[in-house]
From Swiss-Prot:
Subcellular compartments: Cytoplasm
Keywords for the protein's UniProt record, in alphabetical order: ATP-binding, Chaperone, Cytoplasm, Isomerase, Nucleotide-binding
GO CC field: cytoplasm
Function: Together with its co-chaperonin GroES, plays an essential role in assisting protein folding. The GroEL-GroES system forms a nano-cage that allows encapsulation of the non-native substrate proteins and provides a physical environment optimized to promote and accelerate protein folding.
Family listed: Belongs to the chaperonin (HSP60) family.
Lineage, uppermost ranks: Bacteria, Bacillati, Bacillota, Bacilli, Lactobacillales
A molecular-function term among this protein's GO annotations: ATP-dependent protein folding chaperone
Pfam families in UniProt: Cpn60_TCP1
Class of this enzyme: isomerase
Gene: groEL
Gene Ontology terms: biological process: protein refolding
Matching CDD domains: GroEL
Designated name of the protein: Chaperonin GroEL
Amino acid sequence: MAKDIKFSADARSAMVRGVDILADTVKVTLGPKGRNVVLEKSFGSPLITNDGVTIAKEIELEDHFENMGAKLVSEVASKTNDIAGDGTTTATVLTQAIVREGIKNVTAGANPIGIRRGIETAVATAVEALKANSVPVSNKEAIAQVAAVSSRSEKVGEYISEAMEKVGNDGVITIEESKGMETELDVVEGMQFDRGYLSQYMVTDNEKMVADLDNPYILITDKKISNIQEILPLLENILKTSRPLLIIADDVDGEALPTLVLNKIRGTFNVVAVKAPGFGDRRKAMLEDIAILTGGTVITEDLGLELKDATIEALGQASKVTVDKDSTVIVEGSGDAEAIANRVAVIKSQIESSTSDFDREKLQERLAKLSGGVAVIKVGAATETELKEMKLRIEDALNATRAAVEEGIVSGGGTAFVNVLSAVEALDLSGDEATGRNIVLRALEEPVRQIALNAGFEGSIVIDRLKNSEAGTGFNAATGEWVNMIDAGIIDPVKVTRSALQNAASVASLILTTEAVVANQPEPASPTPAMDPSMMGGMM
């Protein structure tokens, strides 16, 4: 395919147009009075959302060069979402601000490499200042505030706070659709471990790329399954019950894996295979935990058991199992309550007698998985469109809350960025590096400016007053009042703010240092052949 190439200013300006189109679409959602964006879907009703990364992923531009600029900003949003789970709109706004200011200076003759070094130094200083200003999150009220700010709903804040209290900060919290109109919290017994499906063809939901198994049997073994004949008698017996199967094994390879996948694709048998969690002796202990939780038996040579002799009675059972590419969640295992309690007691005694911090940490992880359970937030809404929007908001809020517990919180509403301006200004840089620092100084003001603009206020006036206010005081865009942001519950997780800034600076610097862009030439449209007059019959 022929390529289209642009150089220097032409290349950068085309990419900047794409950056602006995407950022201008996303940034209208920022702040408490941000608007929604409606996304057309190829099937079903349109999606109404204010989630930055969801909007960014949907944008495809006709011009190849502009589209590359837009895709780079979309990458910033996606990366921030992967790391912190929130802050994608802020990251997009920061990227646009750094690119705009940077392009002005590069066009005026500044060296982009020097600017990049200045940006990197300034961002590193800003991140350190953000961490220094952070306040740890420990109580239920603070957790609820973080979730409420992210979701724009105090009720959602209460649900997430309560869920984290019941299953622990590192506990498993999932979000499902409710059958009714009310959103509710449900805590059920369950276990999660960090192993995903061995083949993506095992998924049952192609959009979310997850496999949901209702009322499955669970085969638990520390053996490697390579020959399908070893488990064929067992599979035939399970097939008669019409129930799905989860296989937890050392590995599934050879002819066994493609055979299982083929039967899954044909619809003969709903089966998902995952590798056993942990390593060595710890793996054996975790498999035993799963067996006790689900009422099954570990098929292992230690007990003199062989796969070919396994029966349905040796299998574990659960109400539901959800498997994605990275993890498996077992909900409501059918294990005996007394056996589970005894296992928990054994692990607790091992924790008390352990002299290794590492071993103690791993034992506590096992204890949490065995006794903590899974919290399920069931989202209810009047319409499917509202339900989708609500689920996205709750997912963002949950991610933001976990980030806050991990690294602490700072003043929200963009105030935290303005509070670190003095630390960045104090950097002793010269030449193009000083220009890079000044670009970051201007970009750090942009989130507050945009939040104020979306709320109907003049951003420059808000910025000027904020710079002259004491640290911690900020502008509440929801009410138009000046308040102590943390006392008012307007807070952002440090992990979210720093991730947004770091990712924005990284991609913006790449755009500024771009000197050539290579794109595919659009294929010429094939002309429609003229109709043969003789085929027109009697049409007049």
